[in-house]
Amino acid sequence: MSTAKQNLSVQRWVAAISVLLLAVKFIAYYSTHSVAILTDALESIVNVAAGFIGLYSLFVAAKPRDQDHPYGHGKAEFLSAAIEGTLIGTAGLIIIYKAVQNLIHPVELHKINYGIWLIAVTACLNFIVGYFCLRTGKRNNSLALIASGKHLQTDTWSTVGIIIGLVLLYFTGYKWIDSTIAILFALYIIYTGYKILRTSIAGIMDEADVKLLSLLVEVLNTNRRENWVDLHNLRVIKYGTVLHVDCHLTVPWFLNVHEAHKEVDALGILIRKEFGESLELFVHSDGCLPFQCKICNKTDCPERKNNFEKRINWTLENISQNKKHELK
């Protein structure tokens, strides 16, 4: 099964289970009238909406690139995550509003022990599904699955906190505990929504992934070949599960086209080995210039004009510049 199809299959399960958990949580709310349980139920509405939005985005992202979308449809995942983050934040605000109302005008609570058991079951299911979703998303580089997994895990921990609060309420009878729990976890939900939204906007705006670039630079330095005289103008863009890498690779000027292409192929094989097969590599090969002899450690070079002095270590700062490197 391809990565895109696997992502789609997992998201189908997420959407289906979210509907089931939503029903269970609303049964618990109508049985107890607890605003803390309502907090959980409202977030489950977001889970359902986000699950189906994520499902659609993965369906779109799985489409092959076409004439209108030469880089594919991967950015649909970023849009999905942005909507999900917004929905999570909105749910948090609604929960705070409802909790404050209940602090001012308390309502009678019923069957708290019954509600505790129901939402405990949903917490267990959420944790299992969220863990599997997050693991698959990280393995397949799917932002939509990662967002869904984080969302479900957040829901799990908030449910656990709500259960603890409801147990205290059950034994003490203090009604204000119900609303206080709801407000605390609503703030946590809003924070989670912000983080998901921030990540998705970074993807939409093609913000540089510093962690990914740093790892790539480390891999290139460690596995540097003798004919890779220099590397510059390195850029990485991620569209869904596909990584697009482009750079300028300087090779000895006397290599023929076939030999230069072998060096480009070696670069592609190295990056795919470390980052997976979902990769598009665009490399512009440059011939070396006399001033670069000082940074070239090729031992059998027949055209050397200057003695080798020092190999320049590639860093995040110098490898991204559109400029050939030289010793000052």
Task: Describe each region flagged by the PLM.
Residues 2-17, 24, 30-42, 46-328:
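Alpha-helical transmembrane segments and adjacent TM-loop junctions that form the membrane-embedded core
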